[in-house]
Amino acid sequence: AQAKKHKKAKIYIDKQSKIFSSKRFIKKDELLRLISSKNVDTVIAAISGSDGLELIHHSIISGKKVLIANKEPLVMAGEFIVREAKKYGAQIIPIDSEHCSIHQSIQGKRENSISKIILTCSGGPFFNLPKSKFKNISLKQALKHPIWKMGQKITIDSSTLMNKALEIIEARYLFNIEPKKIDAIIHPEG
């Protein structure tokens, strides 16, 4: 939606999409040149997995404001990303989920003034299931999230609460806070 709104936006997608006309797409080498340009001040990093790490690092060493839309880069390389951002004067800003809300709520506060971060999770499809029945859980049951419609991997991560563990790692690096000061609580309404 943002790319359509901003007519001159350049789009790099690691897999070709039918959403936009092909003349709006650019190749990776062109993207790296564009990121380095003085005309670019902000880069949205929304490539899943490790594929986006090179682009994030290039944005950081170019001193850009990097809007991160997923947790994977910080889970894989959080310490490196934060260290490089400080070194090159880049900003790392989360634009996804609870981390975006936390970021917005702590603006203007001293970094060490955060005493605790509490992340919520729905508890997934097995919240009320007795532990004795866990051994009989099927893939179909695990893929039926009570609140969200998501892809298979994120649904399984959510069902097993692994997603929340990854978000704790993400928060640790984004907000420079020790893991013992980050809690996750179940809130069934999601």
Where are the predicted features?
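A short hydrophobic/small-residue beta-strand
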Residues: 65-66
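Basic phosphate/pyrophosphate-binding loop/patch that engages nucleotide-derived ligands
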Residues: 80-94, 106-117
